[in-house]
Amino acid sequence: MAASTDIAGLEESFRKFAIHGDPKASGQEMNGKNWAKLCKDCKVADGKAVTGTDVDIVFSKVKAKSARVINYEEFKKALEELATKRFKGKSKEEAFDAICQLIAGKEPANIGVTKAKTGGAVDRLTDTSKYTGSHKERFDESGKGKGIAGRQDILDDSGYVSAYKNAGTYDAKVKK
């Protein structure tokens, strides 16, 4: 079997992958999604000797019939089954040691995770200096919002429409 340092690293990797993506997980049990992620990230599933389908089949074999998760002991059984398939020319013990070395000390990778986009349309929408029309009146020169003063239309109840320029000159034109 694998050396004690490999076993400790293997258990640590099991716990890290078991809690990945689930803030409520205890790290004692791993679901099928995280098992598949572990096999893919640690290069156990290489796409040739071991495929994603093989990984799912082994998971289904080792878990209990009604269970949806595996514990650490079932995890080791699953690795033994995959080890002989992944490393065909080696004995069972050598293959298990090799697969333990692939997994020991690894963490879930965040490759392919979507990053915040900062170009094109997003830049125009978040830069207040580029606002036009009535929206630019809602912000001062520094880009800070003016609050209610920037949003509130002051009611002009003088009787004139807003575009009329000669407000207040009618009485001067008409003599009484």
From Swiss-Prot:
GO terms for biological process: decidualization; embryo implantation; microtubule bundle formation; microtubule polymerization. The modification N-acetylalanine is found at A2. GO terms for molecular function: tubulin binding. The keyword Acetylation applies. Pfam families: p25-alpha. Residues 134-144 have a biased composition (Basic and acidic residues). This is Tubulin polymerization-promoting protein family member 3.
